[in-house]
């Protein structure tokens, strides 16, 4: 995205956030900035193109290493293919389910600003304020610790784990509570997987995910604001937060038709794209597995982890 385009989005965003949130901590402002990055990333000018590009490069690498194997067809079965058919199989991208993905993405993008700003700009800072107040009552005044890069790494890790836990709980509940499943099953109605499938949601699902995200960011932000007496920023790599890097890449590839397994030892800690393919499978042995967004920790603790074997059959729907 060009710098002028970024300023077009970010400057009004900062003004709106300041008006809605007020002078809370720097952590709240960082949360606000992250919120608006998410909104901006859903605009047609920036559909996570960096992660999509990395996805394609990695897919080419898989095609080379596996000599044309690893791609899935619309029936969910692995099949060898030439490079172009490996990357863009016709039976997937012309499938009616893929066309529905496009329409639901457009709908989600139009509706998101209507509820996203309100929920994220109120729930997050409110949770942060409540956490700071609770710690002050229970323990005392903010500690005012010195911010180091090690603390920034810890803040990034705790934010990731807290977000992933809240995501796991919401996702698990959506599969267990009939009323919530009626909302979430729109996502699981996808018969093929494309990068746009990540946005294939009922219009009521977005506010639920947004509220959960804001709650997790706010609670962690409150703890670290109390520890340091002010805001702390997340550690970055190439000017991108570690959390955003992991989530963005994983989100793009796990709704891609190429199966990408991690080594088993790594799959015990991080969700591979192939593990999310299991989550989308309609085989009964795959039901209600792999609920978390990034890590495998919560699925391991709650007994819902499923690590697929190489080229395991995963029909979607």
What are these regions (language model features)?
Residues 16-24, 69-90, 172-188:
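Short, charged cytosolic
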Residues 22-39, 84-86, 134-147:
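Interfacial loop/helix-cap signal at membrane boundaries in integral membrane proteins
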Residues 24-29, 85-96, 265-268:
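Short, membrane-interfacial amphipathic segments enriched in basic
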Residues 42-46, 232-234:
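Interfacial loop-to-helix junctions that mark the boundaries of transmembrane helices
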Residues 46-137, 155-167:
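Specific transmembrane helices
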Residues 84-85, 90, 308-317:
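Membrane-embedded helix-turn/re-entrant segments that form the catalytic/gating core
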Residues 107-120, 126-137, 141-315:
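Membrane-embedded catalytic scaffold of the fatty acid hydroxylase/desaturase
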């Amino acid at each position: 995205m060009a710098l002028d385009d970024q300023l077009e989005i970010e400057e009004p965003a900062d003004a709106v956030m300041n008006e809605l949130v007020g002078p809370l901590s720097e952590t709240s402002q960082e949360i606000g900035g992250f919120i608006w990055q998410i909104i901006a990333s859903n605009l047609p000018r920036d559909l996570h193109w960096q992660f999509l590009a990395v996805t394609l490069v990695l897919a080419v690498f898989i095609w080379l290493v596996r000599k044309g194997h690893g791609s899935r067809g619309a029936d969910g079965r692995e099949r060898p293919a030439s490079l172009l058919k490996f990357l863009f199989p016709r039976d997937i991208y012309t499938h009616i389910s893929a066309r529905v993905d496009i329409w639901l993405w457009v709908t989600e993008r139009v509706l998101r600003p209507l509820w996203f700003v309100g929920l994220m700009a109120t729930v997050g800072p409110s949770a942060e304020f409540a956490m700071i107040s609770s710690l002050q009552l229970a323990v005392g005044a903010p500690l005012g610790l010195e911010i180091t890069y090690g603390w920034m790494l810890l803040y990034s890790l705790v934010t990731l784990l807290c977000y992933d836990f809240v995501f796991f709980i919401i996702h698990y509940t959506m599969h267990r509570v009939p009323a919530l499943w009626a909302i979430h099953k729109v996502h699981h109605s996808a018969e093929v997987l494309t990068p746009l499938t990540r946005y294939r949601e009922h219009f009521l699902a977005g506010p639920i995910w947004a509220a959960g995200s804001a709650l997790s960011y706010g609670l962690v932000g409150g703890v670290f604001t109390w520890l340091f007496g002010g805001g702390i920023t997340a550690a970055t790599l190439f000017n991108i937060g570690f959390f955003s890097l992991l989530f963005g890449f994983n989100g793009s590839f796990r709704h891609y038709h190429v199966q990408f397994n991690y080594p088993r030892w790594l799959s015990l800690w991080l969700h591979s794209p192939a593990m999310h393919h299991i989550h989308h499978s309609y085989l009964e042995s795959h039901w209600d597995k792999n609920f978390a967004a990034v890590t495998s920790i919560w699925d391991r603790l709650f007994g819902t982890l499923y690590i697929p074997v190489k080229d395991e059959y995963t029909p979607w729907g």
